[in-house]
Amino acid sequence: MATVIKTIGTNGRDYSTITAWEADLDNSDIYAAGDNAVGVCYNDSAFSGSLIIDGGQTIGLNSVTLTVAEGDRHAGTPGTGAILHGNISSYVLTLNSKNSIVEWLEITSPGTPAYRMLYMPWPGHWESRTARHLLIYDNNRGVSNTSQGIYAPFSCTVHNCMVFRLKYP
């Protein structure tokens, strides 16, 4: 069991998008059963769109972690770290791989109201999913009072996250 770390951003990183990194989580040329996959984002790239992290299950990864490089993490205020701009009307980030962690990202969707900013559905297994040290902000849902910040119904841990400026009609 190895920890395989891949960098995400510009300037010679392994991947230019989080989506490209996630698409390779079941790539047997990169990972083996039992590996721990770690994607490290840098604040030198614009990450945008809807992201679903559900890879690694076919190959049998032990865990999947999406994090931000230590020097590029937010300082507790918007715009100070690596940002995932949703700008999509569904889910900005869906965390659906077993034993998965997302941490230190800023998640925002100011342009297009998102249904939910972070969605951690029950994937049919009881392995944990964890969200920590996230900034989730600026979503003007404008439709209903649905839980639009973090939706984490089963087998999830959420800690040290700040959720703010989410608006209802």
Region roles according to the model:
Residues 22, 37-40, 63-65, 105, ...:
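Short Gly/Ser/Thr-biased coil->beta-strand turn/linker motifs
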Residues 67-68, 97-109, 125-141, 153-169:
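Right-handed parallel beta-helix
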Residues 3-41, 46-48:
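Acidic Gly/Asp/Thr-rich repetitive segments characteristic of extracellular carbohydrate-active
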Residues 116, 144-150:
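Glycine-centered small-residue motifs that form tight turns
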Residues 30-35, 59-61, 144-145:
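Short helix-terminating capping/connector loops at secondary-structure junctions
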Residues 73, 140-143:
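Flexible, glycine-rich phosphate/dinucleotide-binding loops
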Residues 46-65, 73-103, 108-126:
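Extracellular beta-strand-rich solenoid/capping regions of secreted or surface-exposed proteins
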Residues 1-3, 34, 61, 97:
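Sequence-level motif detector for i,i+2 pairs with an aromatic at +2
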